[in-house]
Amino acid sequence: MDLINEKLNNLENNATKSPKEAVILLNMGGPNSLYEVGVFLKNMFDDPFILTIKNNFMRKMVGKMIVNSRIEKSKKIYEKLGGKSPLTPITFALTERLNKLDPSRFYTYAMRYTPPYASMVLQDLALKEVESLVFFSMYPQYSSTTTLSSFNDAFNALKSLETFRPKVRVIERFYASKKLNKIILNTILNTLNNRKSQDFVLIFSVHGLPKSVIDAGDTYQQECEHHVSLLKELMQQKNTPFKEVLLSYQSKLGPMKWLEPSTEELIEKHRKSHIIIYPLAFTIDNSETLYELDMQYRLMAERLAVKEYLVCPCLNDSIEFAQFIIERVKNLKE
């Protein structure tokens, strides 16, 4: 009888300890299999924040054309990455670490273009009777194409659940955090692995955007430039000089004018130097970091006879990044 009572008490204690606040890490997602490559591309190019064509019919038509032109090439990219994007499993590992470090909250994640979608995650949290939510954008800098798209999707999904009305707070950018930037600098130094920083051109490569998006008022370029300036200040404080510190834009798509300079241009321009790349706009490794930066541009660097070409990993599921997320959530104002 005592054993039964003990088990009942344990169940009651566990129920009492069940977190009433959930933190949802919001990101773009990536194919979880080669089959999902089509799903990923279709959802991305049907997003009005990505393909800013106001007419729904025209957007779907143009999006379908883009998907058809890119799907086979994209599948080959993901084949080189093991048949899927690393973004989802790394994010899962990050939430596992977060839940161990901070059991007072429940950490989970939702993706914009592949499962688990925000609607699925929120339905699960409604069943858990969560009372408050934090939508945490995994993009350090704000952009309508990433942050706003994810928030819009999450809030629409929440609105559709008529009986679930938790308190909601958001973290929409965090690039200005000194703690974050110290972690980034340490990642760069770890990648250098005792090489002399002053021998290297440091390129902060970020995802590119069409110039028209910036002209329409998106603050992304401004925030990326500010982020680099903050990191330069930190490098001066830490007496960590580089030959040059530059900002570049990658992943151009289509004939329209995009933000410049491109990462390829800077690699070619500094072909006679040692180069180290840090993916400043991403916190979790994905095809743009592991394929584009670490494979495609590495081959380019080899053809150009670049003296040395290094690519830093993203923050991923590191304990330092997990601790940063927890601190950011705890310090979030009501």
From Swiss-Prot:
Its EC number is 4.98.1.1. It comes from the Bacteria. CDD domains: Ferrochelatase_C, Ferrochelatase_N. Its main location: cytoplasm. InterPro entries: Ferrochelatase, Ferrochelatase_AS, Ferrochelatase_C, Ferrochelatase_N. Pfam families: Ferrochelatase (PF00762). One of its GO terms (molecular function) is ferrochelatase activity. It catalyses: heme b + 2 H(+) = protoporphyrin IX + Fe(2+). One of its GO terms (biological process) is heme biosynthetic process. Keywords: Cytoplasm, Heme biosynthesis, Iron, Lyase, Metal-binding, Porphyrin biosynthesis. Pathway: Porphyrin-containing compound metabolism; protoheme biosynthesis; protoheme from protoporphyrin-IX: step 1/1. It is found in: Cytoplasm. Fe cation binds at H207, E288. One of its GO terms (cellular component) is cytoplasm. Catalyzes the ferrous insertion into protoporphyrin IX. Belongs to the ferrochelatase family. This is Ferrochelatase. The gene is hemH.
